[in-house]
Amino acid sequence: MDYILRILPNMFAGLGVSAQIFLITIVLSLPIGILLALVRISKVAVFRKLAEIYIYVMRGTPLMLQIMFIYYGLPLMLNVQISDFLAAILAFVANYAAYFAEIFRGGIQSIPKGQYEGAKVLGFTYRQTMWHIVLPQVVKRVIPPLGNETITLLKDTSLVYILAMNDLMRVTRAFVQRDFDTMPFLVAAVFYLVCTAILTKILTYVEKRYAVYEE
């Protein structure tokens, strides 16, 4: 118990780094995902194809590879310096925006075409139809799959240890290697499980709230 109490401050600090990456990724990737989804169903073939290729590449390659490419590859190609934190954010946002885009695309395409036609008769523009009629319904429908991806994101933040960032996973590995003790792994597991439980509760609450409004 004394050992756990000694490592807890560092573990909490590592959790803070992981939480920053998680929150920033959510805040940025959700709106980008919506925009990508709209481009993906656009009537402009060039834009639609570009969005399709982007989503295919992001979903078809490992997130770890994307992190390493942005951190090591982009500086060589563009002759710029990228911090480990910025590289992690860019990689996570680029990756999860693609996944969110496909979720939103499926939600948008599930809306009956009659609603678009009805909105047009009422004088709504395409933008107004999307904003006031389609997207509010889409949000209700995509909460479960978005929740699943959000929980996956929480666990994926552990991948940033390859950038030598002091996230929860790297701090844990450092203690294990230094002290030859596996207890930090158990503590880290508890941290992730508690965070996942809290996130699941929040998502369940949001889903129920939308269900009430739907009724």
Segment roles from a protein language model:
Residues 1-215:
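Transmembrane alpha-helices and adjacent helix-loop boundaries
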